A protein has these predicted regions:
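Outer-membrane beta-barrel translocator/receptor signature
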Residues: 1-62, 66-72, 125
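Acidic/polar loop-and-plug regions of large Gram-negative outer-membrane beta-barrel proteins
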Residues: 44-48, 61-67, 71-134, 138-140, ...
Length: 196
């Protein structure tokens, strides 16, 4: 957070149906600058390069600072982000992109080898604080703490490449078995940093 006024709003549009808006506000809450805040946010959506793939992100980051004197500083920090659609996580094979297919053609640049119902979403939360107090020119105490939680949900089927040798039975079987991932994952972390 800053004690000087900050007021910023942004709008952005671009190719692939990109639409984005964001804001960043910060200021002191009192005349002495003892209390200050900052609020930053973002909303974004776009189509990914591959067909049927989208990106969506919503984030907000509130922060609050308490400075009772010039030797003490306590800042509360937080960040919340939701990505209902994170875009395309597949890959395109060498056959059909770098090298032509046996029929001489190449895959389109928006080719999606996955299933139409592929999804990958992510939700992140972080809260913490930063504290320091200067006793004198020699001794200062600092502590930073952060708790983070990350949840992901995935449902996807994807290919391993193009079967370039149809006479090979193993290749036929290998190309027919597309791997699938489905799951929900949760990670929680605590980070503490002390300095004296």
């Amino acid at each position: 957070p800053t004690t000087e006024p900050l007021k910023e709003v942004q709008f952005k549009a671009g190719t692939d149906s990109l639409f984005q808006t964001g804001f960043d506000f910060s200021d002191a809450l009192d005349d002495d600058g003892v209390y200050s805040y900052r609020l930053t946010g973002l909303a974004r959506s776009a189509n990914a390069q591959q067909k049927g793939s989208e990106e969506q992100r919503y984030a907000i980051a509130p922060a609050f600072t308490w400075r009772p004197d010039d030797k003490t500083n306590f800042t509360f920090l937080s960040y919340f982000q939701n990505e209902p659609e994170t875009g395309y996580y597949g890959w395109l094979p060498k056959e059909g992109t770098v090298e032509p297919l046996p029929n001489g053609k190449r895959l389109p640049t928006d080719f999606n080898e996955g299933a139409k119902n592929n999804t990958y979403s992510r939700n992140e939360k972080m809260v913490g604080y930063s504290f320091d107090h200067e006793f004198n020119d020699t001794f200062t105490v600092r502590q930073n703490l952060r708790f983070a939680e990350n949840k992901t949900s995935q449902n996807s089927v994807y290919g391993y490449g193009v079967c370039s040798d149809p006479a090979n039975a193993y290749s036929k079987q290998y190309a027919a078995l597309a791997p699938a991932d489905k799951g929900h994952y949760l990670a929680r972390k605590y980070v503490v940093d002390d300095e004296k």
